[in-house]
Amino acid sequence: MVTRCAEKIKPVLTYIRKALIAALLLHCDETGTRVEGKTRWVHNASNERYTYLTLNSKRGYAAMEEADILPYFTGTVVHDCWNPYWKFDNAAHQLCCAHLLRELNGVIENHSDQTWAEKFRALLLKMKKAKDRAIEKKKTELSYSSVHRYKNQYDELISLAYSENPAPVTEESKRGKKKRGKVLCLIDRLKKYKGQVCLFLENFSIPFDNNQAERDIRNIKVKTKVSGCFRSFDGAVEYLNIMSYIGTAHKHGINSFRAVLFAVWGKPYAFGVGTE
């Protein structure tokens, strides 16, 4: 029945993929799973209305290309700063600030001398609160002066961070650059991607975090933890196709059992178009 269901929903998956390409906002994430005793990667592309999961032996750019959404997407993609996402420069990018908060918490807990990290965490939360309050008041944007003030504070804290973490000096007798630690790499990232960290503050349609993608991929993590692995690659693909369909059904207020039943009957829900 699994194979039959997976076969019947193929046209719907094509529609979901096209709907995500045409969307203004896309959440992306990836997680490892076990297939035939080997590590394989589940890639998620989703938003509040659609879920699309694919399987690949690779985690990076090639796998994202094969998923066939990001190469054509021109809206805003939210992600955790995994380097291959930046190669898709046809889209705008928003970094997951919840992920950044976790990294900052790690710095705070493990490096008591890093005063900038606590202040930077407070700034991100202050920015989020300012946006949330504005939305509660039915506003569609923050004032230019407010955004400018937060960005200035951002720059000041980056300067403080560098003052507390001077770049390592390479001895003249040794070749190459000296390796930068995790803290300095985080600071470099925050400086380089300031625009992609703060985008949510300037555009209220863009979220602060990537929780949507994390929710949509959570079932895969649970299945991997409980069941161990998939027996075959084709079986894993069928499972992900069905989970894409069920996840999308749930977002449209459709009961999972009903959605699968209609698919097996050869009448899968074609979301946004009606029932085929």
Predicted segments, located by residue:
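Catalytic center-proximal scaffold of phosphoryl-transfer enzymes
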Residues: 1-276
